[in-house]
């Protein structure tokens, strides 16, 4: 029998008790104080010295910090893991929208999207294979222009939540570009491998 848990969208989901206990054990090991602070979150992702990566991780942290107290407690941790591991596409896109909307006005403008795309490009550069290295990429500005061209239905220069979700559902390229990697395992592994070499 599982525990009822309300996810970010207010829906009841069931989490297995054994799984919840395992998550708690991991949380206590990583955060003996019972709360996860920004500096610990950054350390986990190995981004203390990388400004662009730090901004990306700070945005993720703020999105997981539901009550805005600048810490992630166990319930917020469980909600984050539930989103990452089990979340429906729409929930992940809603969360991604919240991360991208840095000023919290309910819309994403070009400068906000450009900042995120540039950060993601810098983060992902580390993980590109040799074949990918030879494949020319669009510049971050070209990515943002193309996304707005495909997704900004009313042409107001801002993406609403509905435009963001609809655009991602209609176009696979847009989906790939808009859907934030909330489980950047390859990037984390690469960062840890690099730090082990020094």
Swiss-Prot record:
Tissue expression: Retina and pineal gland.
Binding positions for Ca(2+) 2 per the UniProt entry: 101, 103, 105, 107, 112
Keyword annotations: Calcium, Lipoprotein, Metal-binding, Myristate, Repeat, Sensory transduction, Vision
GO biological process: regulation of signal transduction; visual perception
Annotated residues for binding of Ca(2+) 3: 152, 154, 156, 158, 163
Residues annotated as domain EF-hand: 16-51, 52-87, 88-123, 139-174
Lipidated residues (N-myristoyl glycine): 2
Binding annotation for Ca(2+) 1: 65, 67, 69, 71, 76
Molecular function in Gene Ontology: calcium ion binding; calcium sensitive guanylate cyclase activator activity
Lineage top rank: taxon: Eukaryota
InterPro entries: EF-hand-dom_pair (IPR011992), EF_Hand_1_Ca_BS (IPR018247), EF_hand_dom (IPR002048), Recoverin (IPR028846)
Miscellaneous information on this protein: Binds three calcium ions.
Entry function: Stimulates synthesis of cGMP in photoreceptors. Thought to mediate Ca(2+)-sensitive regulation of retinal guanylyl cyclase (GC), a key event in recovery of the dark state of rod photoreceptors following light exposure.
Descriptive protein name: Guanylyl cyclase-activating protein 2
